[in-house]
Amino acid sequence: RGLGDVYKRQDIFFNYAKSAEEKGFKVIIAGAGKAAHLPGMCAAIFPMPVIGIPMHTTSLGGRDSLYSIVQMPSGIPVATVAINGGANAGLLAAKILATSDAALLDRLKAYSQSLKESVQKKDAHLQEVGYKNYNK
C-alpha cells in the first residue's frame, strides 16, 4: 500500500507503521526519494526488518536518497538495496520470510536455479557466436 508523501500525511503514516506488527507484517519495504525519511521512520517504529529503496531523483540521480537510507543511526537499521532496486527489495523480503516458510524457500531456490540456467544459456550462445554477433 502506498502512503504518498509522509510529510503531508503524518497521521496516516504513523498509524500504518504502528499497526503493521499487529496486522501480521513480517517485513516492510519502503521506497523514498530525496531526503528519504520513510524507510528510517518505518524502522524506528516497526520492530521487524525494513528494506529501504532509494528512488532516483532528478537533482542527484538518487544518491541523496541512497545516502539518507544507508546512514541510519546506530540501533535503527534499514537494509538498503540499489537505487530503484525494487526487484531486489522484493527478493530480500522473500528471503527473510523464507526463514520460516519452507514452500517459499523452495520457490526461491527454483528461481535461483532458473537465473543460473539463464546465464549458462547466454554464455553458451556467446561462446557459439562470439561477442561481435551476440546481439544480432
Residue ranges and their predicted role:
Residues 2-7:
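Short, small-residue-biased leader/transition segments that mark boundaries at the very start
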Residues 8-18:
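Structural motif
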Residues 10-11, 32-41, 60-63, 86-90:
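Short glycine/serine/threonine-rich phosphate/pyrophosphate-binding segments
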Residues 16-54:
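Glycine-rich phosphate-binding loop
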Residues 38, 42-82:
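Long, charge-patterned amphipathic alpha-helical coiled-coil/hairpin "stalk" segments used as oligomerization
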Residues 63-136:
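C-terminal binding/interaction regions
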